[in-house]
């Protein structure tokens, strides 16, 4: 099969379409012929040699894809069935082996290609806001990086579930994009201090920046507020005052989806399909795929994401 590999470990953009072994199936896995794969920040970091896959998982990049079951193995699934796939790796290839519990249906109103840009972001956003932070209607939610793939999905999901949403982004154009998705409060982090603008406002914060925002995030939370950190794009280290947290009973969770064990991922997929797929199918959440590249041009897709110029989701097609 064809797959994307990093030709030179010292050059994260040296992505080449090369020949690779088609995966062999373990018990409980299906072989999926990939139609399209979503591009995520984790793929860029893996290409830099800083985010290796969990032990035993594919070394090929790609944390989500969608396609058609080629071989159902021992699962009892149907050959030719269209599915979305949550992956620990392997999506940047013609074929990928997927644990049955990490398969999703294709939403009734989406194409297979659109589904490729939904699975990982939906599972990430729901598992952190819905399952970990316990988000409920009426909550006030701050989303950092509101114009990206995670942020644009989170805005729509929060609004669909009856929350008030504030976002940070770095340009007027990106903030306008967030407004069109439903964001209520828009903050340009290059010109405004979100902690001063929103001091004590947020019930929940979804953060992809990490250490540099830690102290400001704590200032922004209200009593019983929850900070969920899912990436460290700005670095892993910051200052945290427990003295500011304890009187207001604040909590901080730092987590990734990729490293979770398969049974936990299967539970997340089930809960996401149950709670989020209906919002997609009734049109309250749309995938917002704003750029598509053929698999062979994965380096261009990574360049676009790394530039910060894109909004929404980037997808690779086979």
Predicted regions and their residues:
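Short, well-ordered loop/turn sites that connect or cap secondary structure elements
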Residues: 76-77, 135, 221
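Adenosine-nucleotide cofactor-binding segment
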Residues: 143, 159-216, 265-267
